[in-house]
Amino acid sequence: MLNVAVVGASGYTGVELLRLLYCHPEVAVTCITSEQSAGRPVAAVFPTLRSRYTQVLENLEPVKVAQKADLIFTALPHKAAMEVVPTFLELGKRVVDLSADYRFNDPAVYEKWYEPHMNPENLKEAVYGLPEIRREKIGDAWLVGNPGCYPTSVILGLMPLLKKRLIDPSTIIADSKSGVSGAGRGAKVENLYCEVNDGFKAYGVGGVHRHIPEIEQELSLLAGGPITITFTPHLVPMDRGILSTIYARLTGTDSVAELVKLYAEFYEGEPFVRVLPAGNVPSTAHVRGSNFCDIGLAVDSRTGRVIVVSAIDNLVKGAAGQAVQNMNIMYGFPETMGLEGLPLFP
């Protein structure tokens, strides 16, 4: 049995981790921390976990956490993670970090979009945790930087086209829509019910969203050269889910049937990527609560552009589910273990 800790469990990602880990037959959750709710029972903070988690939330004391767990999930905000991750590693613990702190290859990029990185030594050793790209490296990693939700949906949507050199990389436009849980659980006026209900708005417009450098880093590695994209996120009045519509000019085949066949072959054997038949596009309703990424394709013959639509649950494949998938790879468990639940519908 693998003993794990969830650090920063009072947010949406934290509770999603607890939900998924409860169903994992090889895992025991031995420590759960929350600075905001320390001293309160887990079920008092998250009634959905009542009668399943009897622990009391603890303060974050890194040495004590490390004494209780072999693997530590850090579900903390950026900067807060890199304040504790070095201690966990020094004490011989493996870490899956769900913040942005260990996703980048270059600390200068992190500094440009966030702030100066306090732990560049471990940043260099961290493995970007998108299993469909880095499965082998994840298996040997001591520190995995779990990908962001938007990057997961965009990278998986574009990977076959870039690897097969079928698009002009300079023409990529990604238009993504997210449920409100993507903004976190903290109280913010702009996320109140009356602010988001019956509304649909863009944000981070003009190339300023912090997920842009993460997307560009991974797409550039796939393409073998620097890529700059146009990316605009939107907030939609639903709890969870991300739908990304991605456009690029084709340089190869414009047959939808051939592109669908290419994607199906490329992702053959990937347990969580589902390529839809030609003429079908995904819906967030069909991946809700699951670790799936659904992908559909179309071609606009008038403009010579391919349209890729990808759907994920931002809290599962976009966060906690992917973290559990990475844990499975790190410890040699079946990759789907604890993640085999079907999407919730309706």
Swiss-Prot record:
User: What is the E.C. number?
Assistant: 1.2.1.38
Q: Which terms under GO biological process does the entry name?
A: L-arginine biosynthetic process
Q: Which reaction does it catalyse?
A: N-acetyl-L-glutamate 5-semialdehyde + phosphate + NADP(+) = N-acetyl-L-glutamyl 5-phosphate + NADPH + H(+)
The protein in question is named N-acetyl-gamma-glutamyl-phosphate reductase
Q: Where in the cell is it found?
A: Cytoplasm
What the protein does comes down to: Catalyzes the NADPH-dependent reduction of N-acetyl-5-glutamyl phosphate to yield N-acetyl-L-glutamate 5-semialdehyde.
Q: Which SUPFAM superfamilies match?
A: Glyceraldehyde-3-phosphate dehydrogenase-like, C-terminal domain (SSF55347), NAD(P)-binding Rossmann-fold domains (SSF51735)
Provide the alphabetized UniProt keywords: Amino-acid biosynthesis, Arginine biosynthesis, Cytoplasm, NADP, Oxidoreductase
Q: Which Pfam families match?
A: Semialdhyde_dh (PF01118), Semialdhyde_dhC_1 (PF22698)
Name the source organism. Geobacter metallireducens (strain ATCC 53774 / DSM 7210 / GS-15)
At the top level, the lineage of the source is: Bacteria
User: What is the active site of this protein?
Assistant: 149
Please list the GO terms describing molecular function: N-acetyl-gamma-glutamyl-phosphate reductase activity; NAD binding; NADP+ binding
Say which family it is in.
Answer: Belongs to the NAGSA dehydrogenase family. Type 1 subfamily.
Which HAMAP family has this protein been placed in? ArgC_type1
Biochemical pathway = Amino-acid biosynthesis; L-arginine biosynthesis; N(2)-acetyl-L-ornithine from L-glutamate: step 3/4
Report one GO cellular component.
cytoplasm
